[in-house]
Amino acid sequence: MPPIYVKPENALKRSEELLALGTPQSQQQAFDNLVEVFQSKRFKQTPINVLEPIVTKFIDLCVVLSRKAHAKSGLLVFKSAAQTTNVGAIERVLNHFIAKAEARLAAAVEQAKKEVAALPDVPVVDDDLPLQPASLMLDCFVDSAGDRERIERRLIAPAQKFCWDSYDICLDIAKSNDRLEVIYQSIAHRAFHFCKIHQRKADFRRLCEQRLRKDLANAAKYSHQQHAINLSDPETLGRFLDTRFLQLETAVELELWQEAFRSIEDVHGLIAGRKGTKPSMMANYYEKLTQIFKAEGGKQTAVFHAAAWARYFQHAERAGIVNDKASGCVLLSALAVPLGEVEVKQRLVALLNLPKTPTREALVQDAAAKHLKRVPADIRQIYKILEVDFEPTTASKVLAPLITSLSPEYQPYLPALRDVVLSRLLQALAQVYDSVTLSHILDLVKPLDNTPWATDMSSLEKFLVTACRRGDIRASVDHVAQTITFVSTPPDANGLQTLAVCLYNTIQYLNPSRLAPVSRSDAFAAAIAQAEEERKAASHKRQIVIRRRELLEEAKLRREKEASTALAERLKIKAEEDARRAKEEAKQAEIDRVRKQIHETKQAEAKQLAASLAAQGALKVDISSIEDLDSSKLVAMQVEQLAKEKKELSERLRIVGKRVDHLERAMRKEERPLLAQDYERQKAEDRAAHDRANQIAREQAIEQQRAARELKQRLGRMLEDYEAVKERIESQMQEELKAAKEEARRKIEEEKAQLREKVIKRKREEKERKLKEAREAEERKRKEEEEAAQKAEEEARAAAALEAEAAAAEQRRAEREAQRQSDLERIRAQQEREEEALRRRQAEKAAATSGGSAYRPPARAGTTPPTASPAPSSGGPSWLARRKAMEAQSAGGAPVASSPKPVPSNSAAASAPASNGPESIAGEAEKPALTGSVWRRGMGARRGMPSTRGGA
């Protein structure tokens, strides 16, 4: 069977009826009844105007019953249902929750005050009160505390805890939503006020660290989501800055300086790179910085304290909220900065919005230029003594009446100013003396004894150690001689120049006539040169300012462009979201129409069912007065009617039980006087029983003491026998111990002998093993040497064989060389015969040409008449060159050609006219030109040699 759905307004009415009974059980039942409404799946479909009173009543019950977890879950469900349609309802519910929690805390405080005021002078313990485990534990832990603390822990502490949880829950509900951003800041302000009023330092740190900073980081991280926090909006940024400044003020009032410094960083992170911040807000920012950077906090914080005062005065003057004492604080804070270098802390410099690390000289010069005429006369005189004309011998006398006349607002700077005066005094003495006594320094500061600057020997030594450690002075203290020796420091780059200027000014002051006056023209030239340098510097500075202004304008235009782009993107997203929402609303309207049609159909069917049930008598209600009828609801009404009858029966039984309870109470009321009489009687009987028990215990103690004394006397008579027996037993035990020691010594000697034999045997075996290994190693070495000798012998035989083969090869080469020489001789003879034949043919041709009667053979068809061949010497190398080439080839190298282009063979030209027909001529024409070696030419010439038969 599905669970019965109860309409929210009916659940609210039922809860109010239960609360009207005024019992704890009825409160719990009313709370459970409302919890079922939040757990229903139809909760989000219920109108907000119906849900708001239900949520309000649910919050009231959560506050009364201390159900913070249920309150948080219920608020989350209500937020998810109402954040898109009715944000005002969420704000009203959150304010109501916090108001109820604060009212509960106020009621607890008033109740505690009444109980504390009603406490008697002597605390009375009521034994009739029931003992609770919580009260027992509380009494164990706060046993030493008074009744006031115990009452406050019992009443106020739970209310404070629940109030703090309500702030945390509401901040968690309203975070990261631009629609709930106003209520978020308001709740944060109320939480700060709560922490400040009740001194909840741990809760304040938890609020700042785990809630506000985390929510701001998430807002920047998820800025692209719908309804995200937009820090570019001036109003939103202003509200966030107001919250952070209130956080800073609360941290300062609670003296949580570390949390105040983190709050300063939060404010700086919000205002960094943004314009349009109010001057009053910035003045408040720097004023809180002055409280954090205390002047007496040391050198590293005093300089930032003075810089914060200077920045505060600038913005306060711009906002028109300058304090009368502000100028004096600016100048005194600058003068109170200790001498020496300042450690660079970029984090603090960034918090002050300064371009570089501030220094004492710059702060003093700026403060003197802007505020010297505004400060009181005594502060102005202190400035002149410390910075303009410091005289170590008279400074203390002049400063003594001035520091006593300072107003209370300037008193925090006196300890730091004292250190500055002592530093100036020691630096002035170091320039004049190499060593000075401590008594002399105390005499110089003696006029300050009746002032806050009183200095004794211990404080002076402490200051010397601190100044030397900081590097303000370089000195050593001789405690025996009670003197201070100043250590000379190496001169800096401008030391001689500074000394020369000082000497020049001193001489001019003592004897002006010794220095020649500067001529008017030189003075004008120097002035013109200085003016030109100043003009160039001003021009350079103007260019830098113009460039910076251009860069700032470019950055501003870039930021505006980015902002416009982001705005266009947000508008686009918003338009898309509106279109999507309109589409969803149209879809939802269609769904509602269909749902309404279905509902009407079900209602008609339910009316028919209700009529049938009424006719059967199972339903005893007016059907016409019931709305939203359906079959399941009718069955539920029937079940509810049965439950109602059962409840009426139980109510009658409860009334009877209540009557019996009243009778029991009346009986107990009547027997209460009798109980008091019985208590007095029982108390008297207990007193008598107590006295009797004490008397019996006293008699028993006396009897026990008497028996103990008798026992002591009896045992005392046996003491001598006991001592004798004891000595005999001890001597016997000594003899047994001696015998045992002797036996143990004998066994140890035997064990030593056995161990010695084992060691000797092991050493002998080790020695034999080493000898065996040495013999084996020597045998292996001998075998290796034999193998090496055998291998060397084989290599020698192989080398001899190679040498024999080389000799045989050399002999064969010599034989080939001899054969080649014989071939060359034969070729040379053949060449000579060819040349002789060639000359003879040429001579015959010449004779035939000159005589004209020589015989010529008839020319055959297809042949070419022979032509004269050139001389042999005109083509190719000589026979000597060909011989050298032949020798080179026989030596193993390739034949080297003496000419790059081939030369036709002389034998071919000589054999052309002596050919024996066309076949012979054609065969000779088909052969390629022989451009190879010489002996082939010779062979070709020999084959083509002309015959001498048939000559002239």
From Swiss-Prot:
What highest taxon heads this organism's lineage? Eukaryota
Report the main location listed first in the record: cytoplasm
Which SMART domains does the record match to this protein? PINT
A GO biological process of this protein is: formation of cytoplasmic translation initiation complex
Q: Which residues form the signal peptide?
A: none
Q: Which residues form a coiled coil?
A: 522-849
Q: Where in the cell is it found?
A: Cytoplasm
Q: Bias category Basic and acidic residues: which stretches?
A: 757-797, 810-844
Residue stretches spanning the membrane: none
CC terms in the record's Gene Ontology section: cytoplasmic stress granule; eukaryotic 43S preinitiation complex; eukaryotic 48S preinitiation complex; eukaryotic translation initiation factor 3 complex, eIF3e; eukaryotic translation initiation factor 3 complex, eIF3m; multi-eIF complex
What GO molecular function terms would the record report? mRNA binding; translation initiation factor activity
**Composition bias, Low complexity:** 798-809, 856-878, 893-918
Entry function: RNA-binding component of the eukaryotic translation initiation factor 3 (eIF-3) complex, which is involved in protein synthesis of a specialized repertoire of mRNAs and, together with other initiation factors, stimulates binding of mRNA and methionyl-tRNAi to the 40S ribosome. The eIF-3 complex specifically targets and initiates translation of a subset of mRNAs involved in cell proliferation.
Q: How does it assemble?
A: Component of the eukaryotic translation initiation factor 3 (eIF-3) complex.
Under PANTHER family, the record lists: EUKARYOTIC TRANSLATION INITIATION FACTOR 3 SUBUNIT A, EUKARYOTIC TRANSLATION INITIATION FACTOR 3, THETA SUBUNIT
Instruction: Report the sequence similarity comment from the record.
Output: Belongs to the eIF-3 subunit A family.
Identify this protein by name.
Eukaryotic translation initiation factor 3 subunit A
